[in-house]
From Swiss-Prot:
The keyword Nucleotidyltransferase does not apply. One of its GO terms (biological process) is cytoplasmic translation. Belongs to the universal ribosomal protein uL6 family. The keyword Cell membrane does not apply. PANTHER family: 60S/50S RIBOSOMAL PROTEIN L6/L9, LARGE RIBOSOMAL SUBUNIT PROTEIN UL6M. It comes from Campylobacter lari (strain RM2100 / D67 / ATCC BAA-1060). Part of the 50S ribosomal subunit. It holds the Pfam family Ribosomal_L6. GO terms for cellular component: cytosolic large ribosomal subunit. Keywords: Ribonucleoprotein, Ribosomal protein, RNA-binding, rRNA-binding. This is Large ribosomal subunit protein uL6. One of its GO terms (molecular function) is structural constituent of ribosome. This protein binds to the 23S rRNA, and is important in its secondary structure. It is located near the subunit interface in the base of the L7/L12 stalk, and near the tRNA binding site of the peptidyltransferase center. Disulfide bonds: none annotated. The lineage of its organism: Bacteria, Pseudomonadati, Campylobacterota, Epsilonproteobacteria, Campylobacterales.
Amino acid sequence: MSRIGKQPVAIPSGVEVKLEGNLLKFKKGNLAKELDTKANVNVEIKEGQILFSPKGEDRQSRAYWGTYRALTQNIIIGLTDGFSKTLEINGVGYKAALKGKVLELALGFSHPINYAIPEGIEITVDKNNIIVKGSDKQVVGQVAAQIREFRPPEPYKGKGVKYSTERIIRKAGKTSKK
């Protein structure tokens, strides 16, 4: 029994939800999202809540039940509040700057790295912090992971790009024989 799937998803004021066949359509202002359940779960909209139930009693149906409920919750949170991830840049000479829709990173390579910002994502740079914001949780996480991938933090000095919540396990360097 899915503990997540059986919880109803509340529809906040200002968010419109429509069910057209297997397609859930969400709208708030000029932002619109869609979720196709592909007929894997039963969906009902009652009294300002979205209710999910499994199609069958098999393991796969129960797995989809919780998954689609979580995806729906993330879409609603994304439309109302949005998601953000903060990255920190540590290292001498490591910098980030915004130039239009391109994030320019100087991460100790012989050349700057230019990262084209995807549609629907807003990036702000504040000294050594890069803040990635957007309404789609998956895209925000993917963009943050791609930026981190350019120079992941190394364990000896901690130089590189890391999430603000990430803790780097440090290693001791070589000890010299005397």
